[in-house]
Amino acid sequence: MAVPNELKYSKEHEWVKVEGNVATIGITEYAQSELGDIVFVELPETDDEINEGDTFGSVESVKTVSELYAPISGKVVEVNEELEDSPEFVNESPYEKAWMVKVEISDESQIEALLTAEKYSEMIGE
C-alpha cells in the first residue's frame, strides 16, 4: 500500500501536501481501499473556511458514506471539480488525480502535528 514519504497524514486517513502556504488534501490509498468503489464525492465550495477536525465533505462508496475531516484549518482556494463527474479517481489515483481541496494554511503548527509517512504506516499496520 502506497504511503508517499513527502506527504503528511491525519489519523482520519487524509493526506496533506504542503506547497508554500497552500495545502492540498485528499484521502489515502488505505482509506479508499477500506471504503471500496467510490460513487460520489461531496466537497466544500471555493472560499469556504474549514477548521481542523471538522467535516468538510464526504465520500460515498457502494458500502458506506464516510465523512472527510479537515486535517488543518484554512480557506479553500481550489476544489477538484473533476471528482464530481469522476469519483472513481479516488480509487484509481488517490494521491494524484483525486486530490480534493487546496487550502490556504492559517496555522503552520497544525502541519507539524500531522503524522509522517512512517508513523502513518505504523498506524495502519503496514
Curated annotation (Swiss-Prot):
The modification N6-lipoyllysine is found at K63. InterPro entries: 2-oxoA_DH_lipoyl-BS, Biotin_lipoyl, GCV_H, GCV_H/Fam206, GCV_H_sub, Single_hybrid_motif. One of its GO terms (biological process) is glycine decarboxylation via glycine cleavage system. Keywords: Lipoyl. Residues 22-104 form the Lipoyl-binding domain. It comes from the Bacteria. One of its GO terms (cellular component) is glycine cleavage complex. Transmembrane segments: none annotated. Gene3D superfamilies: 2.40.50.100. It holds the Pfam family GCV_H. Binds 1 lipoyl cofactor covalently. Its cofactor is (R)-lipoate. The glycine cleavage system is composed of four proteins: P, T, L and H. The glycine cleavage system catalyzes the degradation of glycine. The H protein shuttles the methylamine group of glycine from the P protein to the T protein. Belongs to the GcvH family. This is Glycine cleavage system H protein. It comes from Staphylococcus aureus (strain MSSA476).
